[in-house]
């Protein structure tokens, strides 16, 4: 069935029609989150050529361990590994059609890597892995499978601004926020869950699931095991799904501080409970490979796996990419070294920015994971409102030339919080960013 058509607003009545999806404003790209990216693109910082330019601190990209990947590829001769087998047979193997849901060798390697990240505390069946072109595609595909247009997913705030696009735009599904606050470090409570569910019911919106990020983006903190258990109990009582986006699971500074929902499921025998749980993963954050566009859906539900395989034809990963990464992820000596060093480098980088901000008189939420910190500038707001927050964000963007993400773009229930990324730049660039913040705070104190 085709999409219903409507006229695009224009003074020209003869304009050709576009679909409702095309002219919808649910793409989310009018958010300050994306406006900051545009400001960076127009005036990017460069240490030599544009030292006064905008420093991009709104992009959660992991560049701190790229040297490890480059060294591995140089030593392992990627020409052979990326083609599977060498020469003409390898080329033929890549050039012809493959299983839409992913090459078996790569799914096996991905399953092993996901187990390794979790310290062997959860097992993953390669036959339950469906490959997608990144986590963005995985989350959207799952939303298509779990919900109908005008249904809703409950999502705890603050949440990743891109979810407004990924979960809503093409699917027609709504996001109903689970409002969390700083009184308990923004952890999800049973009361907040029930309140969000009731809000949806009062609006005659059918709730189809809860979607969380663990570790949280933008908080940079893991979800506690008890909270995960409460979430699953809630989903069972309401007969809805639980989606856990775990794309930062390998970026927890200390592995023991992370509990995957897979560990909870591991100890459950009841199939009717297990089959409502779905995990999203990607190599974009932990391995720092967003350009490779590799994401996965892992579901304990046979029907979801079956449908995701069918839908994955719209979001394939190239065979060449799969062959190369299968070779890399199957090298356990390399992956163990990479995970260990990457965790330590991220922890040191986090400590650098948090201590630097503290010296400037700025506090952050205590974090233990991810590529960002959650910074509290509420004390600088002239007005304790969303407009007041955006005014401060505008000053930071235009006067300090720093692009950070305001909490309102993450639907935070409290004003004055900002997400600040630290892993997509050199240590020297981070020091320059901190210097700009220190100078800004000094000026504020004088006036």
From Swiss-Prot:
Pathway: Alkene biosynthesis; ethylene biosynthesis via S-adenosyl-L-methionine; ethylene from S-adenosyl-L-methionine: step 1/2. Its cofactor is pyridoxal 5'-phosphate. The keyword Ubl conjugation applies. It holds the Pfam family Aminotran_1_2. PROSITE patterns: AA_TRANSFER_CLASS_1. Substrate binds at residues 61, 100. The modification N6-(pyridoxal phosphate)lysine is found at residue 285. SUPFAM superfamilies: PLP-dependent transferases. Its EC number is 4.4.1.14. It catalyses: S-adenosyl-L-methionine = 1-aminocyclopropane-1-carboxylate + S-methyl-5'-thioadenosine + H(+). One of its GO terms (molecular function) is pyridoxal phosphate binding. It comes from the Eukaryota. Induction: By cycloheximide (CHX). InterPro entries: Aminotransferase_I/II_large, Ethylene_sulfur-biosynth, NHTrfase_class1_PyrdxlP-BS, PyrdxlP-dep_Trfase, PyrdxlP-dep_Trfase_major, PyrdxlP-dep_Trfase_small. It is an enzyme of class 4 (lyase). GO terms for biological process: ethylene biosynthetic process; fruit ripening. 1-aminocyclopropane-1-carboxylate synthase (ACS) enzymes catalyze the conversion of S-adenosyl-L-methionine (SAM) into 1-aminocyclopropane-1-carboxylate (ACC), a direct precursor of ethylene. Belongs to the class-I pyridoxal-phosphate-dependent aminotransferase family. This is 1-aminocyclopropane-1-carboxylate synthase 7. It comes from Arabidopsis thaliana (Mouse-ear cress). The gene is ACS7.
């Amino acid at each position: 069935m085709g999409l219903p058509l409507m006229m695009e607003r224009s003074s020209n009545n003869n304009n050709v029609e576009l679909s409702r999806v095309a002219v919808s404003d649910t793409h989310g790209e009018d958010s300050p989150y994306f406006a900051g990216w545009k400001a960076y693109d127009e005036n990017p910082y460069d240490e030599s050529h544009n030292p006064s330019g905008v420093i991009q601190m709104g992009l959660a990209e992991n560049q701190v361990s790229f040297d490890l990947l480059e060294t591995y590829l140089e030593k392992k001769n990627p020409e052979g590994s990326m083609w599977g087998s060498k020469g003409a047979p390898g080329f033929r193997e890549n050039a012809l059609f493959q299983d839409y849901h992913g090459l078996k060798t790569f799914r096996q390697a991905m399953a092993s890597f996901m187990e390794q990240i979790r310290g062997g505390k959860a097992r993953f069946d390669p036959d339950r892995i469906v490959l997608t072109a990144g986590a963005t595609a995985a989350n959207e595909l799952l939303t298509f499978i779990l919900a109908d247009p005008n249904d809703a997913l409950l999502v705890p705030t603050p949440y990743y601004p891109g979810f407004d696009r990924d979960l809503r735009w093409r699917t027609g599904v709504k996001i109903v926020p689970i409002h969390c606050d700083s009184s308990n470090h923004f952890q999800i409570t049973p009361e907040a869950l029930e309140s969000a569910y009731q809000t949806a019911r009062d609006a005659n919106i059918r709730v189809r699931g809860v979607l969380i990020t663990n570790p949280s983006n933008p908080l940079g903190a893991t979800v506690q095991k008890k909270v995960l258990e409460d979430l699953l109990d809630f989903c069972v009582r309401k007969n809805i799904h639980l989606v856990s986006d775990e794309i930062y699971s390998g970026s927890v500074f200390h592995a023991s501080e992370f509990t995957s929902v897979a560990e909870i499921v591991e100890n459950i025998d009841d199939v009717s409970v297990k089959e409502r749980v779905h995990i999203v993963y990607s190599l974009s954050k932990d391995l720092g490979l967003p350009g490779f566009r590799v994401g996965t859906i892992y579901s304990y539900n046979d029907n979801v796996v079956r449908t995701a395989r069918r839908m994955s034809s719209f979001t394939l990963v190239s065979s060449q990419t799969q062959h190369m990464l299968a070779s890399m992820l199957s090298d356990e000596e390399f992956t163990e070294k990479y995970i260990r060093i990457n965790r330590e480098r991220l922890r040191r980088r986090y400590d650098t920015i948090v201590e630097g901000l503290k010296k400037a008189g700025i506090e952050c939420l205590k974090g233990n994971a991810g590529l960002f910190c959650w910074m509290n500038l509420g004390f600088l707001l002239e007005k304790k409102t969303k407009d007041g927050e955006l005014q401060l964000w505008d000053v930071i963007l235009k006067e300090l030339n720093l692009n950070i993400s305001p909490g309102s773009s993450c639907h935070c229930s409290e004003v004055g919080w900002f997400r600040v990324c630290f892993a997509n730049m050199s240590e020297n660039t981070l020091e320059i960013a901190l210097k700009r913040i220190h100078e800004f705070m000094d000026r504020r104190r004088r006036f």
